[in-house]
């Protein structure tokens, strides 16, 4: 077992040109998450585009949802390196549980399909990575829903087929170094893996879940897992947990951290996995969350994609029957200029929002539901599944 401690070079102040440009822009803009009382600056692009696709074949759906945005080639150029960040929060225990069929983790078939799209577009290298709650992740247990293969095997296949590196990375042990990103919180800076800061393109692929500390965990919150456990974690009950240093006292407090990370990293694309997710007191079943299979509520799986992460997450919130105006991270992200949340400024490509919205139980924080549920037309004529 490798020790959870930094090597001397892990905290080296050197940063890539890409990260320098990004953090310089952050500093120049006076990026301070805590200053949420400021007037909203709004996004630079007045209209965001969110692609939505329904179906039952996740591999096929990936191509379709990207095609509606102009294809992956509109994001990834030939010769560029790509980092893909799925949500693999319970992968360390996937061998003994239902991390994927239970809705806790991003589905491996989606991740592999996105990686292949990038390679097909000419990407020089694709890395899939996460930190989760372990030093080394058992990627061989990231099994597809049909059980036919796993993410480790699929990345090896893609590497051989395209003749370019396609790999998985456990950030705690595979990060060459850790790069400081400015934050307006008391931390001053936040370390993130250099695998993201040196990549030409960064793609967030979360699974749709409610969260007992963050309200929702989608493409923005997904980046909490790229910070090192050795700096921000501890071992309560033997499980590394970033909540030891990162302030989880309220949705606003934790959002102040991961939104500054997003602003420093500047992701290029979000793809939201709406196949099987979590409602109620997520992000895990062990916390009191409940599995949501979209085939039961929508009649099919659903994928969202957008180059605007705030717009993607805002649309996801609406589909989950949550009021985006009461989801703290979305309001904060909009005020920071990270993206669009105004409904009339988001173009939904594909099915109508009213045809996608499903009942989805909110998380409870301190015994109170923080998000007002909107009326969902799918509740008419049947028992309310939010309480079933």
Task: Describe the function of each predicted region.
Residues 45-112, 116-388:
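Extended, low-polarity segments enriched in aliphatic/aromatic residues
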Residues 23, 34-35, 181, 226:
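Generic signature of intrinsically disordered, low-complexity segments enriched in small/polar residues
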Residues 20-22, 338:
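Extended, hydrophobic interaction surfaces within ordered domains
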Residues 12-19, 30-44:
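N-terminal twin-arginine translocation
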Residues 24-28:
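Sec-dependent signal peptide hydrophobic core
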Residues 1-15:
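N-terminal secretory signal peptides
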């Amino acid at each position: 077992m490798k020790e959870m401690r930094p090597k001397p070079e892990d905290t080296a102040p050197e940063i890539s040109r890409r990260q320098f440009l990004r953090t310089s822009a952050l500093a120049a803009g006076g990026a301070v998450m805590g200053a949420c009382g400021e007037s909203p600056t709004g996004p630079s692009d007045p209209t965001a585009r969110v692609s939505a696709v329904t179906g039952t074949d996740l591999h096929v759906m990936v191509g379709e949802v990207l095609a509606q945005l102009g294809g992956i080639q509109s994001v990834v150029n030939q010769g560029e390196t790509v980092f893909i960040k799925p949500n693999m929060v319970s992968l360390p225990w996937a061998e003994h549980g239902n991390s994927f069929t239970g809705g806790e983790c991003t589905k491996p078939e989606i991740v592999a399909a996105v990686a292949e799209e990038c390679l097909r577009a000419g990407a020089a290298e694709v890395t899939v990575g996460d930190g989760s709650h372990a030093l080394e992740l058992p990627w061989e247990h990231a099994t597809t829903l049909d059980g036919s293969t796993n993410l480790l095997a699929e990345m090896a296949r893609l590497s051989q087929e395209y003749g370019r590196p396609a790999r998985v990375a456990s950030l705690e042990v595979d990060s060459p170094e850790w790069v400081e990103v400015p934050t307006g919180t008391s931390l001053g800076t936040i370390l993130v893996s250099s695998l993201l800061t040196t990549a030409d393109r960064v793609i967030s692929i979360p699974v749709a879940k409610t969260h007992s500390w963050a309200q929702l965990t989608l493409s923005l919150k997904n980046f909490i897992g790229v910070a090192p456990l050795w700096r921000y974690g501890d071992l309560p009950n033997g499980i590394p947990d970033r909540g030891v240093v990162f302030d989880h006292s309220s949705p606003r407090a934790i959002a102040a951290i991961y939104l500054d990370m997003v602003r420093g990293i500047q992701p290029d694309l979000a793809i939201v996995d709406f196949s099987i997710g979590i409602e109620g007191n997520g992000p895990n079943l062990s916390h009191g969350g409940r599995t949501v299979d979209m085939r039961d509520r929508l009649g099919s799986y659903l994928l969202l994609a957008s180059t605007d992460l705030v717009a993607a997450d805002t649309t996801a919130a609406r589909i989950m029957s949550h009021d985006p105006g009461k989801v703290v991270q979305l309001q904060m992200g909009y005020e920071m200029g990270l993206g669009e949340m105004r409904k009339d400024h988001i173009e939904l490509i594909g099915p109508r929002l009213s045809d996608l919205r499903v009942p989805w139980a909110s998380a409870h924080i301190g015994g109170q539901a923080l998000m007002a549920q909107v009326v969902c037309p799918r509740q008419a004529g049947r028992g309310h599944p939010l309480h079933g």
